[in-house]
Amino acid sequence: MGQKSNPNGLRLGIIRTWESKWYDVDKKVPFLVGEDFKIRPLIKNHYPKSTISQIEIKRLKKSNDEFIEIDLYTSKIGIIQGPENKNKNSLINKIEKLINKKVQINIFEVKAINKIAVLVAQNIAMQLQQRAFYKAVLKSAIQKALKSGVKGIKIIITGRLGGAEKARRDSISMGVVPLNTLRADIDYAFEEAHTTYGVLGVKVIINHGEVLPNKTIADTRQIFSSQYENKKNNNKRHFADKKNFKKSTS
């Protein structure tokens, strides 16, 4: 039987970029990868579910490897920061104690939570843990996603559905979800729901459309707030100014 590859990993280097952005000598790479695997679950466990959609870890300067910059993308900035930044500062202290390095955390707000596969999967898992009927939960999630403007969505759930004695698999989909089209912006997430009947697996696959030339994932998804858009536009202007400077000097 053929096995399906992870849609996120399949598009790395084509339309998607890595969530850990750094480089170093070969001897240090395993150690730094291990650090990333420690940092990510620490951040996820520090906050409640359906709060953080993406974590980016950056070590941009090779000479200054004692400094780490972490970008958190969230729909609930108030929970991430806390009163007087208490939650954010306590998280920084935990990470610095864990890896013994200086840490800076940047927070970016996402506005369309029903278009992000991670948040949709976590929300479904939370409702299943609260003993909601799984078919109603899936239909509600799909309707909200389609209203927010996605091209297609597919949700797969496995386990003892509805408390049945035998585990089975059920899925529901609407719209177009082309997993083999590499230029299609496919957002994939997996989450577990721990219920009294056992563990249920939830997979969410969302199609945001095709990433055409001179466009990025941010253009197809349109999930970020004005703060992220300003940062992206400033970066575009910076690179454009560099190109114009090179042309004028040549």
From Swiss-Prot:
A GO term for molecular function: structural constituent of ribosome
Keywords annotated in UniProt: Ribonucleoprotein, Ribosomal protein, RNA-binding, rRNA-binding
Domain of life: Bacteria
GO cellular component, one term: cytosolic small ribosomal subunit
Record-annotated KH type-2 domain positions: 39-111
Pfam assignment, any one: Ribosomal_S3_C
Keyword rRNA-binding: yes
One GO-annotated biological process of the protein: translation
Cited CDD domains: KH-II_30S_S3
Family label: Belongs to the universal ribosomal protein uS3 family.
Subunit structure: Part of the 30S ribosomal subunit. Forms a tight complex with proteins S10 and S14.
Protein's job: Binds the lower part of the 30S subunit head. Binds mRNA in the 70S ribosome, positioning it for translation.
Protein name: Small ribosomal subunit protein uS3
Species in which this protein is naturally found: Ziziphus jujuba witches'-broom phytoplasma
Gene name of the encoded protein: rpsC
